[in-house]
């Protein structure tokens, strides 16, 4: 069994991930649940060979030196995969996250008009947040695709690794992969400001320097899209501010209050009848929200989102209620994800 056959099988089953782990049969995650493939267990040598076959020399060297590595891999005609190779107590392991080869449009994903409005802003910071595997990359890809289809701009992305590949439609699109095309997010962002971009996508805002540079880029007239692993708008603001030392916090609040255009926090739910659907909390950078950020009154943000429906804002619970009433998700699924489960 070679790796391309396993990956083709995984993609055909609609799996989000393929897991290889020495001592166990291959497994796939379908609609959120991990299931075994009906194959014999793989030993360390087999897993090691499967992973090594698709690595280049640099990736092998990284894997040997750091005991884990990330890279992307494409099976032509099937899909691209984001790969993490690692070691565990029984030997080698790897996870292949499926990246659909086709960028889904906002229409495909059933995203509302507010996502177009957010994508149309000329400058500022847009954060798409949520836990790992909540579909952030898919949402961002749809937003970039909308810009790419409607505007004559330069889109520059910095990703680790590149997930969705965007063809240049009306826009010029340049995608840079960390460790392959640049040494890191902060290095790429520093030079991005000299590369005449209109839109910058920062795959992950992991550290102080990257967040600082993203804020600067947003302040200097670029539209910056970024991701964080936070689960709500309020937590997102806190997370960004908390990265900075005490003496800079008020300056960062001021920068955020000027440049933040939207925070979209999302989670994935199982759909009735199979598949998954995203639920969002949407906060827009209105004057009221900007004031709350500047004055460090993040706790009041939730009620501002609740009352901001006319401006396109929506709480997660309101979005979940809509999905339940449309018959897309069950009450039980909604209750699991809700901020106030007793409402379901």
Question: What is each stretch, according to the model?
Answer:
Residues 1-344:
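Short, flexible helix-loop junctions that flank or precede catalytic/ligand sites
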């Amino acid at each position: 069994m070679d790796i391309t056959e396993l990956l083709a099988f995984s993609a055909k089953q609609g799996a989000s991930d393929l897991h290889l782990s020495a001592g166990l049969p291959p497994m796939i995650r379908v609609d959120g649940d991990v299931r075994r493939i009906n194959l014999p267990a793989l030993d360390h040598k087999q897993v090691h060979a499967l992973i090594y076959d698709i690595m280049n020399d640099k990736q092998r060297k990284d894997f040997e030196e750091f005991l884990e590595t990330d890279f992307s891999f494409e099976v032509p005609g099937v899909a691209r995969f984001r790969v993490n190779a690692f070691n565990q107590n029984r030997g080698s392991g790897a996870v292949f996250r499926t990246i659909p080869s086709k960028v889904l449009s906002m229409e495909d994903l059933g995203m509302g008009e507010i996502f177009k409005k957010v994508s149309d802003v000329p400058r500022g910071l847009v954060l798409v947040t949520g836990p790992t595997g909540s579909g952030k990359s898919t949402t961002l890809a749809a937003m970039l695709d909308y810009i790419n289809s409607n505007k004559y701009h330069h889109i520059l992305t910095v990703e680790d690794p590149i997930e969705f590949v965007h063809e240049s439609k009306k826009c010029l699109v340049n995608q840079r992969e960390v460790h392959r095309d640049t040494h890191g997010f902060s290095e790429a962002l520093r030079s991005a400001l000299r590369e005449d971009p209109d839109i910058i996508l920062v795959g992950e805002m992991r550290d102080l320097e990257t967040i600082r540079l993203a804020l600067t880029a947003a302040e200097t007239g670029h539209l910056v899209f970024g991701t964080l692993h936070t689960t709500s708008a309020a937590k997102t603001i806190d997370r960004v501010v908390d990265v900075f030392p005490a003496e800079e916090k008020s300056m960062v609040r001021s920068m955020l209050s000027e440049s933040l255009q939207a925070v979209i926090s999302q989670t994935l739910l199982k759909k009735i009848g199979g598949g998954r659907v995203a639920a969002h909390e949407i906060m827009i950078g209105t004057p009221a929200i900007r004031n709350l950020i500047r004055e460090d009154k993040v706790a009041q943000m939730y009620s501002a989102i609740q009352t901001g429906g006319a401006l396109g804002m929506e709480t997660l619970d309101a979005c979940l209620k809509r999905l339940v009433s449309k018959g897309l998700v069950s009450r039980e699924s909604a209750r699991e994800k809700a901020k106030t489960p007793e409402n379901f």
